[in-house]
UniProtKB/Swiss-Prot annotation:
SUPFAM superfamilies: Class II aaRS ABD-related, Class II aaRS and biotin synthetases, YbaK/ProRS associated domain. GO terms for cellular component: cytosol. Its main location: cytoplasm. This is Proline--tRNA ligase. It is an enzyme of class 6 (ligase). Pfam families: HGTP_anticodon, tRNA-synt_2b, tRNA_edit. The gene is proS. Homodimer. It is found in: Cytoplasm. It comes from the Bacteria. It comes from Corynebacterium urealyticum (strain ATCC 43042 / DSM 7109). Belongs to the class-II aminoacyl-tRNA synthetase family. ProS type 1 subfamily. It catalyses: tRNA(Pro) + L-proline + ATP = L-prolyl-tRNA(Pro) + AMP + diphosphate. Coiled coil: none annotated. Keywords: Aminoacyl-tRNA synthetase, ATP-binding, Cytoplasm, Ligase, Nucleotide-binding, Protein biosynthesis.
């Protein structure tokens, strides 16, 4: 097929959009692939839609290959299934909620575990119906607080979500393995550089969870890799290695000191050394201090009176040389919402002395206290004494204070020991493109799905959930593969196989270009033909670089000698070939 640019609905832009920061966002808008409608909401124009459909087909091919069956649920969903799993509340403000004219509650689907489980409950009843893999490719909705980066982080996006249903845990393991391999084939086909990482399950629940992260310097996710093993994890899933517990019997008693003005870790360390305090004979460092962070943790849902749960003050203890990573803390406490206490909270609760909060105040006031795994029994700390200008030294965990639990809240650093005991961690940035979960029986039990097994006994099947951000994949390819001139699409998803450009006003050259485009189309290639009569060769060349087809053939000055120029956009190489050989050369390259 041939698409003529003289009639194509396409308008390229010279300047970057004002709200764009990432290269993929800038180029997809400038090249006329997408257009912004509202914050986080974009229209797909003809060129962009062609790429999106091709990405969908790559995903669909691999899902079908592992026995997946495609269906389609509505995007507008009733409240009731999401109440069964409590996710109507747990999703929090990201869930688009609405009412119809009869005041019935609905939502715009962010993901469809409930609907798939509901469907299986109503349609299947025998072990002979299993295993099953069902999937859809559909638009999803999430009310992002800060939509950004174009289609990478929007409020409306296209996603493939699939669900496996098995009678046994061993069957779930196999379905999970098949999806993992299928995802690798999908991302390999698109030429994406990615890493498979351990991940948290979040509001999805379940046990095993892995993310596929595309490597990107400007990605919003941080992940780690070990220098001496295959270990890789999203930073939110990294488990700290605690030191060995120590006896509290031989520890010196805690001492309260005057510490005027020592209301930060930096000034606390400075004061401690000036006061002559030491740790095992060495000067005090930030690592010897204990930072006590005050948070407000709000559970989703309502209390017995039907009121939203009130925020609960919670103490979070981390070594003083570490900053609190709010993403790690939030992931540890999901689905609760976590906020740092503000000045109003310190005024409201006088037992919280800003800059001098210590662990004892949480126990004395019946507040929950969570600690970093490094705050183990027998470790001694310099920390706040809950009075202005006073600190404790030798405050010992397990003797002077005891955490109610442990939480991963401290930042992960380059050089930290790898959780698998092999090497140290390096940090990189990435963009999540896929996530796979072993959900187990969380949803099937919630919906009371009962299937008769081979012995006639009722059994609850087990589930897996597997997501790919389809529209996000398009942006990731643009982010990883662009150059300073524009987009560079891999052959698997390029809008067209070849871009034919007339760069010669000679009528014979123009006719030859038209014949070449038709011959390439007859050979089975998808051809973009720049036949715009009043556009200069320079503008045509710039547009060809911006649009990013893998091959560009220019019928220009060399045509008088029977030559055309072939440009390989992926490798940025140019060569002259005989016009008579052009169809064979281009077709062979397109099918390589």
């Amino acid at each position: 097929m041939i698409t003529r640019m003289s009639s194509l609905f396409l308008h390229t832009l010279r300047d970057d959009p004002a709200d764009a920061e990432l290269a993929s966002h800038k180029l997809l808008v400038r090249a006329g692939y997408i257009r912004r409608v509202a914050p986080g909401v974009y229209s797909w124009l003809p060129m962009g839609l062609r790429v999106l459909r091709k990405v969908e087909n790559v995903v669909r091919r691999e899902m079908d290959a592992i026995g997946g069956q495609e269906l389609m649920f509505p995007a507008l969903l009733p409240k009731e299934p999401y109440e069964v799993t409590r996710r109507w509340d747990e999703y929090g403000p990201e869930l688009f909620r609405l009412k119809d004219r009869k005041e019935a509650d609905y939502l715009l689907g962010p993901t469809h575990e409930e609907l798939f489980t509901w469907l299986v409950k109503g349609e299947l009843n025998s072990y002979k119906d299993f295993p099953k893999v069902l999937y859809q490719i559909q638009t999803k909705y999430r009310d992002e607080a800060r939509p950004r980066a174009g289609i990478l982080r929007g409020r409306e996006f296209v996603m493939k979500d699939s669900y496996s249903f098995n009678m046994t845990d061993e069957g779930l393991d196999e379905s999970y393995r098949l999806h993992r391999k299928a995802y690798q084939r999908i991302f390999d086909a698109l030429g994406i550089e990615y890493v498979i990482c351990y991940a948290t399950s979040g509001a999805m629940g379940g046990s095993a969870s892995e993310e596929f992260l595309a490597v990107a310097a400007d990605g919003e996710d941080t992940f780690v890799r070990s220098t001496e093993s295959d270990y890789a994890a999203n930073v939110e899933a990294v488990v700290s290695i605690p030191p060995a517990e120590e006896s509290v019997e031989d520890k010196p008693e805690a001492v309260s000191h005057e510490s005027p003005g020592a209301d930060t870790i930096e000034t606390l360390v400075e004061w401690a050394n000036e006061a002559g305090l030491t740790v095992d004979g060495a000067p005090v460092t930030a690592k010897d201090t204990l930072k006590c962070i005050v948070c407000k943790v709000t559970r989703p849902g309502e209390d017995e009176d039907g009121n939203p749960y009130a925020p609960e003050l919670t103490g979070v203890l981390v070594p003083g040389d570490r900053e609190v990573d709010m993403k790690r803390l939030e992931a540890s406490l999901e689905p609760a919402v976590v906020e740092l206490a503000d000045d109003e909270d310190f005024k409201k609760y006088p037992f919280l002395v800003k800059g001098f909060v210590g662990p004892r105040t949480f126990a004395d006031n019946d507040l929950r206290m969570l600690a970093d795994p490094r705050v183990v029994k027998g470790t001694a700390w310099i920390t706040g004494a809950d009075e202005k200008d006073r600190h404790y030294s030798n405050l010992v965990a397990g003797r002077d204070f005891t955490p109610d639990g442990y939480v991963e809240a401290a930042e992960v650093r380059e050089g930290d020991p790898s959780p698998d005991g092999k090497g140290v961690l390096t940090l990189s940035r990435g963009i999540e493109i896929g996530h796979i979960f072993q959900l187990g029986r969380k949803y099937t039990e919630a919906f009371d799905v009962q299937i008769l097994d081979e012995n006639g006994r009722r059994t609850v099947p087990t589930m897996g959930s597997y997501g790919i951000g389809v529209s996000r994949l398009l942006a990731v390819v643009a982010e990883q593969m662009h150059d300073e001139k524009g987009l560079r699409w891999p052959r698997s998803i390029a809008p067209y196989d070849v871009h034919v450009v007339i760069a010669n006003k000679d009528e014979a050259a123009g006719e030859a270009a038209r014949e070449l485009a038709e011959a390439l189309s007859d050979a089975g290639l998808e051809v973009l033909f720049d036949d715009r009569p009043k556009v200069s060769p320079g503008v045509k060349f710039k547009d060809s670089e911006l649009l990013g087809m893998p091959q560009v053939v220019v019928v220009g000055r060399g045509f008088a000698e029977g030559k055309v120029e072939l440009r390989d956009r992926l490798n940025d190489e140019r060569s002259e070939i005989d016009y008579a050989d052009a169809v064979d050369v281009i077709t062979k390259a397109a099918r390589a």
